[in-house]
Amino acid sequence: MPAVRDQAVPVAEISVSEIGHIEAIFRYPVKSMAGDRVEAADLGWHGIDGDRRLALRRTRERGGFPFLTAGKLPDLLRFVPLGPEGGAPGDLPARVRTPEGHEMEVFGEELAAEIERRHRAPVQMMHLRDGIFDQASISVITTDTIEEIGRLAGVDPDVRRFRPNILVRLLRPESFQEDRWVGGVLSFGEPGEGPRVNVTMRDERCAMVTFDPESGRSAPAVLKAIVRRNQNHAGIYGTVIRTGRLAIGQTVRLHELAEA
């Protein structure tokens, strides 16, 4: 486990309240592929150890965002990265299982060819030491928000649609409570000892939430429900200001800060 380190937040705390506990922790070794649900994980400056450290680069892309995501190839969500046998948590995956059950080396030509066949354009697996993230290195959502979206959309409230790093179960159930966390700090575990995340922005959603993680089929009602209910936001993004160990069951506290 890495030593706990801090980055100071340059404003004073005005209140601290216990809001819930960690219900689940996820990491996604390959961007847009299936994730791992883990019991515990080290949280470093660039997010959860092993999270989104690999991504498929579109080799013909010369401008903009070069990496292939499920927004362009929904089938990616059904590819499952497999860790090395006997490997440590956070190790890069050694193989990937396709939706049809075939296992291929993660950096091998066979996997690249399989993705190319589906995407109809060449790709290359890349290792990015600090990870590749859309907005920030940590995302958090609550069980209440997911359940409310499922109710409004008439679909199973599957957390995997939302691809969070941390799923929180609140002490006082309330959907979309995450919106009020922006500008504050979340801490995890024992007071003064566990990791901390500065909540920087609401998580604006895209078509990826519509895709069923098992079948890949689209349910547009999911995104429509988020748009109608909460201006297309569900969950939050944050940056790490104190590293440490995350574990299921840890207490989650919200530190509200005075305005700078």
Language model regions located:
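Metal-cofactor-dependent catalytic cores
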Residues: 2-260
